[in-house]
């Protein structure tokens, strides 16, 4: 949607919107989530580019129909030289492999490119616009992930409340114990903080994507996305971890669901950057070191 390539958007977006194909983003080749993680090379030749390298942590990368990929021209560093491409996942030279992860509910893959040749028409970004465009996409993705994490945190809290209400000890429900109430109150606060941050960030993203929206939304997007990802990541993990504890001895067993939420919370905390990473990004924005 952010690309200036109208032909590519007309071709792919209609199919995505109709549910005919699925698409995913591949850009990082390491455990980092900034521009330094882009190491796949895009060597230009007459009429196109030749790509070589490997992507890691590609969500649904083994099953998707369309890949949106980021690569950099040889010798470029930092934000310079980054290009974005759209290509069918079955393009010759692409190999995909699903990788085992902590979270069985989200499929990740590695995608390897070997002498993959793309035409100039498959380029999504103009020279110099690759990273700014990708950076905004990642911020919007963080907001979407934060909303998912908030829902996971709420569900973790709900299933915990249902369990402790029915669990009796010393002739009474353990939900009536003051210490348990305090812990549940802390979890509710974590969920509400994540929810508020996610709602606000979603409003900012809506303004940014609206052609008639507030022009200042782009400047607010970076701060809102980082704040939402921080609160949602920490809130979800806190709720999932406490859910295991408050379920007692059955909390870590496969017969109960808390372990699924715990794994999802930990994996989602790492995806698109940890809270520590986003705090660093937030500090850079506040001090004017990063747009």
Short names for language-model regions:
Residues 46-50, 66, 108:
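A generic structural signal for beta-strand entry/edge sites
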Residues 31-41:
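Active-site-adjacent elements of ketosynthase-type condensing enzymes
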Residues 5, 25, 53, 85, ...:
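Residue-level signal for inorganic ion chemistry
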Residues 37-39, 57, 88-126:
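Flexible, small-/acidic-enriched active-site or ligand-binding loops
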Residues 1-4, 43, 69-72, 86-89, ...:
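Short beta-strand-to-turn element immediately C-terminal to the catalytic PLP-Schiff-base lysine
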Residues 52-97:
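A short core secondary-structure module
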């Amino acid at each position: 949607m952010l690309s200036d390539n109208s032909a590519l958007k007309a071709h792919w977006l209609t199919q995505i919107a109709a549910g005919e194909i699925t698409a995913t983003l591949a850009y990082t080749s390491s455990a980092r989530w900034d521009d330094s993680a882009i190491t796949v090379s895009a060597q230009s030749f007459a009429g196109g580019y030749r790509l070589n390298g490997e992507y890691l942590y590609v969500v649904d990368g083994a099953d998707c129909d369309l890949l949106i990929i980021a690569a950099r021209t040889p010798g470029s560093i930092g934000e310079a030289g980054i290009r974005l491409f759209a290509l069918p996942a079955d393009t010759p030279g692409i190999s995909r492999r699903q990788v085992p992860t902590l979270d069985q509910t989200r499929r990740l893959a590695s995608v390897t490119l070997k002498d993959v040749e793309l035409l100039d028409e498959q380029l999504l970004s103009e020279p110099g616009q690759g990273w700014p465009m990708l950076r905004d996409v990642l911020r919007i993705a963080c907001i979407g992930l934060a909303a998912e994490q908030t829902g996971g945190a709420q569900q973790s809290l709900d299933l915990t409340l249902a369990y402790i209400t029915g669990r009796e000890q010393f002739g009474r429900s353990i939900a009536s114990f003051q210490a348990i109430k305090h812990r549940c109150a802390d979890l509710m606060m974590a969920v509400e903080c994540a929810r508020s941050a996610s709602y606000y960030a979603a409003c900012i993203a809506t303004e940014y994507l609206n052609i008639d929206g507030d022009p200042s939304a782009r400047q607010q997007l970076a701060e809102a996305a980082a704040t939402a990802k921080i609160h949602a990541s920490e809130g979800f993990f806190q709720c999932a971890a406490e859910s295991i504890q408050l379920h007692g001895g059955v909390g870590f067993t496969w017969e109960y669901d808390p372990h699924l939420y715990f794994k999802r919370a930990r994996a989602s905390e790492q995806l698109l950057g940890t809270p520590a990473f986003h705090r660093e990004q937030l500090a850079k924005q506040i001090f004017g070191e990063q747009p």
